[in-house]
């Protein structure tokens, strides 16, 4: 028989055991050992093990047993550990209960217990309650230590009061506490969080000058704050100071830098840093490569990310699920599902087991490519491999089906989800509601929302916004306003998207007074208008020729720091043009770039060119057209049509004909009306050759009636096609009968083909 097990042996075994329930089983089995009695150390080890893994019910049972067998005055450390474990799992009330029961069990809390519960409260956002605990500690005559002050400083920083934290830091010495690196870095981090860079940098320098011993792990926490904000330059400044103090960065430090560089999109810097680590050390680890691969994928550099996956393997590192899933998700989001599937195949060969995230990425990618059948097959494959789909995976597939108009299949999938014991979220219903609205079935979507409410799901703002947008798009404003009333009655505040949908619908169906009244309500409710809001209002005001009010609204945009865009000015310029104020429109057209720094676009030029051609000022229209070309703003089909029509109306057939040919050369298809207008003008001047050339060019471009395509014989088709085109133009009233007669004879006269004028003139 071997020597008996001592409590220290049992404690060591429990600490090494990874399974908390096996640790408890071993702990309980020792009760049967003759002469063995659990001590504070064995109780503490099993309680910490159970608490760490969240087995709180079992932990509480052991606590009860411990109180009966160990003196309560010795248990403060155990209670502190229990509070911390409850706090880590977000069970704040349970942590508070442990603290409050300490007195009851004759274990008087010291500063350590107060610090523990204050830390739990601050980390969970219960700042007022933490302050009350602190005041209670002071009332009981317990002197706070450096950790107490640090926790309070952390509370101040988390509530955006870094200057209050600094005052507390400066007062620590008068309270008998020596400032340490954690206290300093807490306040420095608070300053950086609130973008007080100068104060943060100054305090950091003061800390180094004070001779405080610098701990690299604490410094890394400070760097994490800055890297999260993407402020890598400030990190470099602090690191330079630290290196001069003889403290060298470790791999964790470099990983933070790489993460920060990737977050800012400075991928070249991140790649260079990884290269330096490979060559000079410390050698990159899985986290290093994961940070870089994530950054590259985020910036759509998927193939480069895959290169680093290969380098990672070559360095002897084993990619984890995060590595593979990041690259797979990147390829899928980039519309390269085939490459993602190849990565999956390679990863599986190397021992990777696809999880919910993998299947979600692939299914989402397939749905975006319209491959819904393959997405469904992949979903079923996942089920067959034992993957238990969660709500997110179901929602991904439901959304994909809905976007492809497969609402019935999406609804069946939602029902299947419920049958399998998964509770649909409001988002699940929102996907279906959105899908129905996109198909124009807004009343059906409204009915689904009523079903949703009957099942105990309350719509959120997104649900209401979908319905309001759907009804507003269909110009059913009474229904849209009814939804708004339901929304308000249930305490859901409309947002800018809600009001924009309503304003857009009202703009098209109601008087501008109703539009402006809704806008007034929006502002009174504290909802800030955005650019889209103002563009809708301008459209309404211009429609009713309220141009002074429209200009006033432009000034209001400036006061509200909302920058106008090309649509804003396009709406205003169009309003002035339709009101006959061409000078005002042109002044505004020039002002948009000079005063508002808004670049003109092709649609904006089209508006002003249209106005000048309507007034038969083709000289100005041609000048603006040339300006467009010089600025590399490509004219579109509408621009050419305006120029052709304008010159034909003013009798300048040569330029009208020139712009028509240029239009067709640039790949734009003129309307039959535009073609007919030029043909008529040419025929009036007896220029049958050019007019016939246009007909033949129409045949070459495939601008022919359907009857032409029924002629199989090539020779007959060549002869018949121009005549059929001509008859089609006459039938659709695009050419005059005079032009028809001239061209009918001209197209038959083979001698015309030999004349030089018949050839289409090159521009």
From Swiss-Prot:
Protein keywords: Repeat
NCBIfam families listed in its UniProt record: PPR
Tagged with keyword Repeat: yes
This protein's name: Putative pentatricopeptide repeat-containing protein At1g74580
Superkingdom, natural source: Eukaryota
Database matches in Gene3D superfamilies: Tetratricopeptide repeat domain
PANTHER family: PENTATRICOPEPTIDE REPEAT-CONTAINING PROTEIN 4, MITOCHONDRIAL-RELATED, RESPIRATORY COMPLEX I CHAPERONE (CIA84), PUTATIVE (AFU_ORTHOLOGUE AFUA_2G06020)-RELATED
Residue windows of the PPR repeats: 39-69, 75-109, 110-144, 145-179, 180-214, 215-249, 250-284, 285-319, 320-354, 355-389, 390-424, 425-459, 460-494, 495-529, 530-564, 565-595, 601-635, 636-670, 671-705
Family: Belongs to the PPR family. P subfamily.
InterPro entries reported in the protein's UniProt record: Pentatricopeptide_rpt (IPR002885), TPR-like_helical_dom_sf (IPR011990)
Keyword tRNA processing applies: no
Pfam families (UniProt xref): PPR, PPR_1, PPR_2
């Amino acid at each position: 028989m071997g020597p008996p097990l001592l409590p220290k042996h049992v404690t060591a075994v429990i600490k090494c055991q990874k399974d908390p329930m096996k640790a408890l089983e071993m702990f309980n089995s020792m009760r049967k050992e003759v002469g063995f009695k659990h001590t504070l150390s064995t109780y503490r080890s099993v309680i910490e093990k159970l608490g760490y893994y969240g087995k709180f019910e079992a932990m509480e049972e052991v606590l009860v047993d411990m109180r009966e067998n160990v003196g309560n005055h010795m248990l403060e450390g155990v209670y502190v550990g229990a509070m911390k474990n409850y706090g880590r799992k977000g069970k704040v009330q349970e942590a508070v209960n442990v603290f409050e029961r300490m007195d009851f069990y004759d274990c008087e809390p010291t500063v350590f217990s107060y610090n523990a519960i204050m830390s739990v409260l601050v980390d969970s956002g219960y700042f007022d309650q933490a302050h009350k605990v602190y005041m209670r500690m002071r009332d009981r005559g317990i002197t706070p230590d450096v950790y107490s002050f640090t926790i309070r400083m952390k509370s101040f920083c988390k509530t955006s009061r870094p200057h209050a934290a600094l005052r507390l830091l400066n007062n620590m010495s008068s309270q008998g506490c020596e400032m340490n690196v954690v206290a300093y870095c807490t306040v420095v981090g608070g300053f950086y969080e609130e973008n007080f860079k100068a104060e943060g940098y100054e305090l950091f320098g003061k800390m180094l000058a004070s001779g405080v011993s610098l701990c690299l792990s604490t410094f890394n926490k400070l760097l994490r704050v800055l890297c999260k904000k993407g402020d890598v330059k400030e990190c470099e400044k602090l690191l330079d100071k630290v290196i001069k103090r003889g403290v060298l960065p470790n791999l964790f430090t470099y990983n933070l830098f790489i993460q920060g560089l990737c977050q800012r999109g400075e991928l070249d810097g991140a790649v260079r840093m990884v290269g330096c680590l490979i060559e000079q050390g410390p050698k990159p680890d899985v986290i290093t490569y994961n940070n870089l691969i994530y950054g590259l994928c985020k910036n759509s550099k998927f193939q480069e990310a895959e290169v680093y996956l290969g380098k990672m393997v070559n360095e002897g590192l084993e990619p984890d699920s995060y590595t593979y899933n990041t690259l797979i998700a990147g390829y899928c989001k980039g519309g390269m599902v085939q490459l993602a599937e190849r990565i999956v195949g390679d990863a599986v060969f190397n021992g990777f087991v696809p999880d919910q995230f993998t299947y979600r990425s692939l299914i989402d990618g397939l749905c975006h490519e319209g491959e819904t059948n393959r997405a469904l097959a992949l979903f079923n494959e996942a089920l067959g491999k034992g993957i238990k789909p969660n709500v997110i995976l179901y929602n991904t597939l439901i959304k994909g089906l809905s976007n492809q108009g497969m609402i019935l299949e999406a609804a069946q999938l939602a029902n299947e989800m419920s049958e399998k014991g998964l509770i649909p979220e409001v988002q699940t219903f929102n996907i279906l509601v959105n899908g129905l609205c996109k198909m124009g079935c807004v009343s059906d979507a409204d009915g689904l929302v009523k079903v949703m409410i009957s099942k105990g799901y309350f719509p959120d703002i997104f649900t209401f916004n979908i319905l309001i947008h759907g009804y507003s798009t269909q110009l059913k404003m009474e229904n849209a306003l009814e939804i708004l009333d339901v929304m308000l009655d249930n305490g859901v505040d409309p947002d800018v998207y809600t009001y924009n949908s309503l304003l857009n619908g009202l703009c098209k169906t109601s008087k501008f007074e109703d539009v402006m009244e809704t806008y007034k309500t929006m502002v009174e409710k504290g909802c800030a208008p955005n650019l889209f809001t103002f563009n809708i209002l301008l459209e309404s005001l211009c429609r009713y020729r309220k141009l002074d009010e429209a200009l006033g609204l432009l000034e209001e945009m400036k006061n509200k720091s909302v920058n106008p865009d090309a649509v804003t000015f396009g709406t205003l310029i169009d309003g002035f043009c339709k009101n006959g104020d061409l000078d005002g429109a042109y002044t505004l057209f020039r002002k948009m770039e000079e005063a508002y720094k808004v670049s003109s676009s092709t649609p904006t030029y089209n508006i002003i060119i249209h106005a000048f051609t309507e007034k038969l000022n083709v000289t100005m229209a041609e000048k603006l057209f040339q300006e467009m070309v010089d600025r590399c703003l490509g004219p579109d089909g509408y621009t050419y049509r305006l120029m052709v029509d304008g010159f034909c109306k003013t009798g300048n057939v040569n330029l009208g004909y020139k712009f028509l040919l240029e239009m067709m050369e640039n790949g734009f298809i003129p309307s039959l009306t535009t073609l007919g207008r030029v043909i008529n003008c040419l025929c009036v001047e007896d220029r049958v050759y050019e007019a016939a050339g246009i007909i033949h060019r129409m045949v070459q471009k495939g601008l022919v009636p359907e009857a032409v395509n029924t002629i199989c014989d090539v020779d007959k088709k060549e002869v018949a096609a121009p005549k059929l085109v001509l008859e089609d133009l006459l039938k659709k009233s695009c050419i005059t009968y005079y032009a028809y007669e001239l061209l009918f004879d001209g197209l038959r006269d083979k001698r015309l083909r030999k004349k030089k004028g018949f050839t289409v003139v090159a521009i």
